[in-house]
Amino acid sequence: MAGYKTNRRTKNAGSSLEMSHFIDAGANKIKSKIRDIERLLKKKRDTLPDTVIIEKERTLDALKLELENAKVRQVIKKNAKKYHMVRFFERKKALRRYKQAVKDLEDKPENKKYIKNLEKSKIDLCYVVNFPKTEKYISLYPVNEEENSEHDADSNLEQTKLRREAFLKLVEQQYKENTLPVSLQKILQGKKLEKENTGVTLNKPNSKSEDAIVRHAHQEEEDEEDDFFE
C-alpha cells in the first residue's frame, strides 16, 4: 500500500463546504455525521429534491472513504508510538551493517561471501525503513521470537517468521524493480516514509499473492534445512 485513499480532489466528494469539516477528522466525528445523513435519507427521501439526495449520497460516500482513512490513521499512530524505538535502533543497526559490508567488499572485491553480505544488508535496511506503518512491526533482529509474538498464549512463532520472510521477499522484489516507497539511495540520504505513504504491503490476508510469497519463503527455509543435512 503506497498510501491510503484520499477523496480531497474528487468530483464526487459531496459538498466541499460540508466535507471540509471532516477531512482528517476523528473516526467518531465522521461516524456521527454518517448516521445523521443516513437517517435523513431514510426518513425524507420521498420529499427531498433529487439534487439534494444526490448531494447527500455523494457526501455519504466521501465520508465513508474518509472514515476508512481515519481508521488507517489511528492504526498508524498507534504503531508509530509502539514501535518507534525498535524501528529507530534497527535502522541504526541495519545502516551500520550496510556500511561494514561496503567496507569489507572494498577490501576484498572478489569475495563472494562479502558480495552476498552486501546484498543482504541492502535488503535489510530497506525492510526496516519501508515496513508498513499499518502492520505490527516484525523485528528484523529480535533477541528471541517472543518479542514479535508479544507473548500471546497461542502465538504462532512460525507464522511470524514466515511473514517476516514474506516481507523481506517483497522488499527484495521491489528493490530490484526500483519501486520501493523509499529507495536505498534515499535511505542513505536520511529519507523516511512520507506522511501519507504507508510503506510496502502484502495483499489482504489469505490472498493468493500473499499465500504464494509465504509458501515460497517456507519452501526456501525447507530447502536450506535439506542442504544442511545432506
UniProtKB/Swiss-Prot annotation:
It holds the Pfam family Efg1. GO terms for cellular component: nucleolus; preribosome, small subunit precursor. InterPro entries: Efg1, EFG1_rRNA-proc. Residues 195-230 are annotated as: Disordered. Belongs to the EFG1 family. It is found in: Nucleus, Nucleolus. Involved in rRNA processing. Residues 220-230 have a biased composition (Acidic residues). It comes from Vanderwaltozyma polyspora (strain ATCC 22028 / DSM 70294 / BCRC 21397 / CBS 2163 / NBRC 10782 / NRRL Y-8283 / UCD 57-17) (Kluyveromyces polysporus). One of its GO terms (biological process) is nuclear RNA surveillance. Residues 27-75 form a coiled coil. This is rRNA-processing protein EFG1. Transmembrane segments: none annotated. Keywords: Coiled coil, Nucleus, rRNA processing. Residues 207-219 have a biased composition (Basic and acidic residues). The keyword Nucleus applies.
